Amino acid sequence: MPACRPGPLAGALLLGLLLLGLPRVPGGEVEKTGVCPQLQADLNCTQECVSDAQCADNLKCCQAGCATICHLPNEKEGSCPQVNTDFPQLGLCQDQCQVDSHCPGLLKCCYNGCGKVSCVTPIF
Protein backbone atom coordinates (compact mmCIF):
# COMPACT_ATOMS: atom_id res chain seq x y z
CA MET A 1 0.00 0.00 0.00
CA PRO A 2 1.39 3.49 -0.86
CA ALA A 3 2.12 5.92 2.00
CA CYS A 4 -0.28 8.82 2.37
CA ARG A 5 1.56 12.10 1.80
CA PRO A 6 0.03 15.51 2.33
CA GLY A 7 0.19 17.78 -0.69
CA PRO A 8 1.54 21.35 -0.73
CA LEU A 9 -1.95 22.75 -0.11
CA ALA A 10 -2.31 20.71 3.08
CA GLY A 11 1.09 21.94 4.31
CA ALA A 12 0.16 25.57 3.65
CA LEU A 13 -3.18 25.09 5.41
CA LEU A 14 -1.47 23.55 8.45
CA LEU A 15 1.06 26.42 8.60
CA GLY A 16 -1.76 28.97 8.40
CA LEU A 17 -3.62 27.30 11.26
CA LEU A 18 -0.48 27.28 13.39
CA LEU A 19 0.14 30.98 12.77
CA LEU A 20 -3.44 31.87 13.65
CA GLY A 21 -3.02 30.20 17.03
CA LEU A 22 0.04 32.25 18.02
CA PRO A 23 -0.48 35.25 20.32
CA ARG A 24 0.01 38.53 18.49
CA VAL A 25 2.05 41.41 19.82
CA PRO A 26 0.81 44.78 18.49
CA GLY A 27 3.12 45.77 15.67
CA GLY A 28 5.34 42.79 16.48
CA GLU A 29 7.50 44.94 18.76
CA VAL A 30 8.84 44.26 22.23
CA GLU A 31 8.61 46.98 24.85
CA LYS A 32 12.02 48.26 25.97
CA THR A 33 13.03 48.09 29.62
CA GLY A 34 12.56 50.99 31.98
CA VAL A 35 9.71 53.34 32.71
CA CYS A 36 9.04 56.69 31.09
CA PRO A 37 9.58 59.66 33.40
CA GLN A 38 6.85 62.25 33.92
CA LEU A 39 7.50 64.76 31.15
CA GLN A 40 6.36 68.34 30.66
CA ALA A 41 3.53 68.65 28.15
CA ASP A 42 4.69 69.37 24.60
CA LEU A 43 2.48 72.16 23.24
CA ASN A 44 3.07 71.05 19.64
CA CYS A 45 1.40 67.64 20.13
CA THR A 46 4.15 66.07 18.01
CA GLN A 47 3.75 62.34 17.43
CA GLU A 48 7.43 61.34 17.18
CA CYS A 49 6.70 57.67 17.87
CA VAL A 50 3.96 55.12 18.42
CA SER A 51 6.04 52.37 20.04
CA ASP A 52 9.47 51.85 21.60
CA ALA A 53 10.68 50.15 18.41
CA GLN A 54 10.58 53.50 16.62
CA CYS A 55 13.04 55.01 19.12
CA ALA A 56 16.82 54.68 18.80
CA ASP A 57 18.99 52.68 21.20
CA ASN A 58 17.43 52.40 24.68
CA LEU A 59 15.08 55.39 24.26
CA LYS A 60 11.41 54.73 25.00
CA CYS A 61 8.30 56.16 23.35
CA CYS A 62 6.90 58.35 26.15
CA GLN A 63 3.78 60.47 26.60
CA ALA A 64 4.35 64.22 27.03
CA GLY A 65 0.89 65.74 27.30
CA CYS A 66 -0.72 65.27 23.88
CA ALA A 67 2.65 64.41 22.27
CA THR A 68 4.69 61.21 22.14
CA ILE A 69 8.47 61.55 22.07
CA CYS A 70 11.51 59.27 22.26
CA HIS A 71 13.06 59.84 25.69
CA LEU A 72 15.66 58.24 27.95
CA PRO A 73 13.92 56.22 30.66
CA ASN A 74 15.19 57.33 34.04
CA GLU A 75 12.56 55.98 36.33
CA LYS A 76 12.10 52.39 37.34
CA GLU A 77 8.89 50.84 38.58
CA GLY A 78 7.91 51.23 42.21
CA SER A 79 8.17 54.22 44.51
CA CYS A 80 10.81 55.44 46.90
CA PRO A 81 10.41 54.37 50.53
CA GLN A 82 9.53 57.09 53.01
CA VAL A 83 12.60 58.45 54.78
CA ASN A 84 12.54 58.09 58.55
CA THR A 85 14.06 61.32 59.85
CA ASP A 86 13.73 60.24 63.50
CA PHE A 87 16.92 58.18 63.26
CA PRO A 88 20.18 59.36 61.69
CA GLN A 89 21.33 57.26 58.73
CA LEU A 90 24.57 55.37 59.14
CA GLY A 91 27.20 55.04 56.44
CA LEU A 92 28.53 57.48 53.88
CA CYS A 93 26.45 60.61 53.44
CA GLN A 94 27.09 61.34 49.78
CA ASP A 95 25.16 61.15 46.51
CA GLN A 96 25.43 57.70 44.93
CA CYS A 97 23.20 58.40 41.91
CA GLN A 98 21.32 61.12 40.03
CA VAL A 99 18.60 59.10 38.26
CA ASP A 100 17.21 55.55 38.52
CA SER A 101 19.21 54.39 35.51
CA HIS A 102 22.40 54.92 37.56
CA CYS A 103 21.26 52.17 39.95
CA PRO A 104 21.75 48.44 39.26
CA GLY A 105 18.85 46.07 38.73
CA LEU A 106 15.54 47.11 40.26
CA LEU A 107 17.04 49.65 42.68
CA LYS A 108 15.80 53.25 42.51
CA CYS A 109 17.63 56.51 43.14
CA CYS A 110 15.91 57.98 46.21
CA TYR A 111 16.57 60.52 48.95
CA ASN A 112 18.14 59.01 52.04
CA GLY A 113 18.03 60.26 55.61
CA CYS A 114 20.98 62.64 55.34
CA GLY A 115 19.69 64.79 52.48
CA LYS A 116 21.54 62.92 49.73
CA VAL A 117 20.40 60.28 47.23
CA SER A 118 21.32 56.61 47.07
CA CYS A 119 20.20 53.38 45.36
CA VAL A 120 17.49 51.70 47.43
CA THR A 121 14.93 48.91 47.10
CA PRO A 122 11.63 50.41 45.89
CA ILE A 123 8.17 49.80 47.33
CA PHE A 124 5.70 48.07 44.99
Swiss-Prot record:
Superkingdom, taxonomy of origin: Eukaryota
GO molecular function, one term: serine-type endopeptidase inhibitor activity
The keyword Cell wall biogenesis/degradation appears for this protein: no
Keywords: Aspartic protease inhibitor, Disulfide bond, Glycoprotein, Protease inhibitor, Repeat, Secreted, Serine protease inhibitor, Signal, Thiol protease inhibitor
Ranges where the WAP domain occurs: 29-73, 74-123
SMART domains, sorted: WAP
Pfam families the record matches: WAP
Signal sequence extent: 1-27
Matches recorded under SUPFAM superfamilies: Elafin-like
Subcellular location per the Swiss-Prot or TrEMBL entry: Secreted
Tissue distribution of the protein: Epididymis. Highest levels are found in the caput and proximal cauda regions. Lower levels in the distal cauda. Not detected in the efferent ducts.
Disulfide bonds: C36-C62, C45-C66, C49-C61, C55-C70, C80-C110, C93-C114, C97-C109, C103-C119
Record-linked InterPro entries: Elafin-like_sf, WAP_dom, WAP_four-disulfide_core
Entry GO terms, CC: extracellular space
Annotated GO biological process: antibacterial humoral response; innate immune response
Keyword field contains Heme: no
Residues glycosylated per entry: N44
Function: Broad range protease inhibitor. Possible function in sperm maturation.
Assembly mode: Homotrimer; disulfide-linked.
Name of the protein in its database record: WAP four-disulfide core domain protein 2
